[in-house]
């Protein structure tokens, strides 16, 4: 209870009640003195959305120094584009999506994507085996590759982040 210049080494029920009151009524300055650091494993396209929150500090594992085999993210379903320009996708699934890769044959999008990822993963490995520096070889890796990072921030920033990113309007993959 800083406002009253009171200090305690234990958390009492009245302190818990005060914490809930302060959070509920958006009196958040007291939450800026405590922090948390999490290690996240997310696809690159999600990491870039997360890193737009400038109240956090980030450290990301670098493919410049780490050349372990990459892992890739796939959505549970391919969603349709939203009619509302404010949203990237709707909940409606695209069924039997077809692409025309390099020929007149039409292929299911998942098959094309799977083949592409196999090719890119193999090419990346071959480039490293040929002695190409990881900092150059990494440029061919796609946005759905997983990356790992540490994310640190105070509790007020975490509360704000979760409020925005768990909202139903946020991209599904961010919510997950």
Spans of model-derived segments:
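Family-specific signature for flavin-dependent thymidylate synthase
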Residues: 1-176
């Amino acid at each position: 209870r800083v406002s009253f210049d009171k200090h305690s080494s234990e958390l009492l029920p009245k302190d818990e009640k005060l914490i809930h009151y302060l959070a509920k009524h958006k009196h958040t300055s007291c939450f800026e003195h405590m922090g948390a650091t999490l290690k996240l494993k997310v696809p690159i396209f999600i990491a870039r959305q997360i890193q737009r929150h400038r109240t956090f500090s980030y450290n990301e594992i670098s493919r410049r120094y780490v050349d372990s085999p990459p892992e890739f993210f796939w959505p549970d379903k391919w969603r349709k584009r939203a009619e509302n320009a404010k949203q990237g996708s709707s909940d409606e699934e695209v069924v039997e999506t077809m692409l025309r890769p390099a020929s007149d044959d039409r292929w299911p999008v998942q098959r094309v994507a799977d083949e592409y990822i196999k090719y890119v993963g193999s090419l990346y490995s071959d480039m490293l085996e040929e002695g190409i520096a990881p900092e150059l070889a990494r440029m061919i890796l796609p946005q759905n590759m997983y990356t790992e990072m540490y994310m640190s921030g105070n509790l007020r920033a975490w509360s704000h982040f979760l409020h925005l990113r768990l909202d139903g309007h946020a991209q599904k993959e961010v919510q997950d």
